[in-house]
Regions:
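N-terminal auxiliary segments of SAM/dcSAM-dependent transferases
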Residues: 1-37
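Class I SAM-dependent methyltransferase Rossmann-like catalytic core
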Residues: 47-61
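Conserved alpha-helix/loop element of class I SAM-dependent methyltransferases that forms part
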Residues: 57-75
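Conserved class I S-adenosyl-L-methionine
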Residues: 75-84
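Conserved SAM-binding loop of SAM-dependent methyltransferases across substrates and taxa
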Residues: 85-96
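Class I SAM-dependent methyltransferase SAM/SAH-binding core
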Residues: 95-130
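A short acidic, Gly/Pro-enriched loop at the edge of an enzyme's catalytic core
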Residues: 133-141
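A short SAM/SAH-binding and catalytic strip from SAM-dependent methyltransferases
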Residues: 140-153
């Protein structure tokens, strides 16, 4: 099963029907915010007046610094394991031709899709990475910030 949020494909073929991880009610607020913003500029404007750590952690473009400096080959594909709410997914979409993001949580994947809805090169697979069958080969693989969730795998 799949659905599209604007241009982003959400793939539920490997989703168990239960989110394996959640930060709780704050994720509902994050989803509401990304559903109501027009673009990244709106999100940045929201952050100017916000001091709550959770919003800054999930939405600040400062997190792009971790790989913004890297010279990716444009005609490449990237697998992002543990994409969460899409903190750096958009950066990957700008850098390479195809991004496949994987996350345990349907809600976090939905936040990611709304946040990055302008990209037409993004597919998000919802499910446990150990259960997902991927035959595609990738030029790059990212596992940023997933160690803390290793107990869920």
């Amino acid at each position: 099963m799949e659905e599209y949020i604007n241009k982003v494909k959400l793939n539920y073929d490997f989703y168990s029907g239960k989110d394996e991880y959640s930060d709780g009610d704050i994720e509902d607020k994050l989803l509401e915010i990304v559903k109501n913003i027009k673009d990244e500029e709106d999100l940045e404007e929201f952050l100017v007046n916000e001091s709550e750590w959770t919003y800054l952690y999930h939405f600040s473009k400062i997190r792009h610094n971790i790989l913004d400096w890297y010279k990716f080959e444009k005609k490449a594909s990237l697998l992002e394991i543990g994409a969460g709410c899409g903190a750096i997914t958009g950066l990957f979409c700008e850098k390479v031709d195809r991004v496949v993001a994987v996350d345990l949580s349907k809600k976090r994947s939905t936040i990611n899709a709304y946040r990055n809805k302008k990209y037409d090169n993004l597919e998000i697979i919802v499910g446990n990475f150990e259960d997902i069958k991927i035959s595609e080969k990738f030029d790059y693989i990212s596992l940023i910030g997933v160690l803390e969730y290793s107990l869920y795998y």
